[in-house]
Amino acid sequence: MINLDEVDASPQRDAVDNWHVRFGIYLPGITFNKGYALKVRVIHEADQFIHGIEPKDFFLDWANGSAYDLWSITVALTPDPASHFGQNGTYLYRYELLLGNEDVSFWFADPFGRAAGLGTLSAFIIEDNPQPFPWTDTGFSVPEIDDMVVYELNVREFNRDFQGVIDQLDYLLGLGVNVLELMPVTNVKEDVEWGYTPLGYFAPDDRLGGPLGLKSLVDACHQRGIAVLLDAVYAHTHPEFAYCLVYDATGEPNPMMGVFAGEFFPDRPGTDYTKEFTRDYFVQLNHYWLREYHVDGFRYDYVPGMYDGPVGQGYANLVYRTYEDSKALARFDGGNGRSKIIQCAENLPDPIGIMSQTYSNCAWQNGLLDRARDMAQWQYVSADFAHRLDPDFLGYPQVFANAASGETFPVAPFQYIESHDHPRFINEFGLARNRDLLGESYGDRSRFYKMQPYIIALYTAKGIPMLWSGQEFGENWGLLDWGVGRNLFERPLHWEYFYDAAGKALVHLHRVMGGLRRVQRALRSRGYFYYYDDPAHLQDGVIAFRREASADGAHPAECLIVFLNFSDSDAEVWLPFPTAGVWAELVDGTRPAVVIAQAGQWAPVVVPSNYGSVYKCT
């Protein structure tokens, strides 16, 4: 089994207060008795580009008989007057593998490195009196699935780095957000990258703020009741990841990579979960992130590349072991031995199956997004859109149950109309004349109002609402369907849109709907969802449905009726109201109330064009 205490670069003081660093790395099948030698090359960051100062080389010892062929050495940081070596600061290191006197792999980073430099370099820090991070999140509890509103963001595009995200957390709270889904934040080779070709799985990227920056972000989120979800790319890696590079170069049997499930890259294999080392690596990785960084779960990218069935060795095994491991941490305690850890599967071919058969309590699914985009593009309204707002109708499970152990927990799909994988939703309504540097057209933001009924639908749907950063003020970047320009081109948010008429209107609506989602139990309930299936509604461009929450002892029963008008004209909508009383409109709070004398009475409601209304009996 992988022991994280014997790998990485670990600074320590000796008995006379001198610094030493212990280096350790597993290279299964790479052994001294085959003629291999391994050295680590170390340099102080301040000396990295100084003429005449070379890295210091140290050869590691192979531990004969170790399960995964551990190589290690403890190095004294003896001060060198001609350089910064031996002084406090950041040190960079990399490994070099030789066979006899010949280089086999000239340069590879530590696959267990806890910090990274720019590019293919690992790092460690020497400082006087290092202190553990001062966490302040002892009382934080992960939100229940039904209470979640998720905000997906690319840290660099959102606001530069981890500190930039911290600066905007109170803004996100105003949108009703209580879960951040961070696109990959671990070390990558390129300066501009989405992060889906990881190089250092244990190291937050230094360009985003490194380990300290990410811990500060998670702690700041927890102070505000916001959970943090990491995008976990466990099906494929960068070709220069150590367990690709070394074994491609040596021809030795690869302990991690191989053909397993649906390969993401056609020209090279991904991670192979039939191999014990692969399974152990990612279980230990999740264990580390949950404890060292206090993250609250994972959005597993491209699950088809990891999944070999509900009792397989890949994805199902990983999420089960991670679920059981999370029970030791108080923030996940859901009572009766249940963990609230967030494990979200991107298994687009079968989101229903993955939530029904594995320890995944949520999943991405493109059903609502696809229907919304088709409606926007072709200017029609479909009953299928209403059904997409009710996952129960589509056969999604409400609960995962392990018949063998008796374990159960609630599950729900993510609901979204935008994600990082798709062009901006506002672009479906028309394109502007100006283009970005790749020649992609921006969306026409003058048609922002067409988004409004979709936003109201998103916050009033069953399932877990997810926003893609910038959606709330009409971000309008284009996006290529393929090619390096898709994920190697930076698209920073146009924060200036927040101040114009379109941005103000959209942000206001997101804030109102986020507040309603937070306050109105019926919008978070697993209770009754009733679609008013009336062909006349569809002809007028209208969808209407009802959300209900049963009385639970502490709260009375609650009923809301939602009207969505996708047309360019105000619409008068008739339907039967289920209870007598005064029905008040909640979105704007300025529209006339509807007075119902008896249950089942039909009454009209005028719904504004390209907008919606939510009525509640008061």
PLM features per residue range, with description:
Residues V303-V311, R435-F448, H494-K504, G600-A603:
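Active-site rim elements
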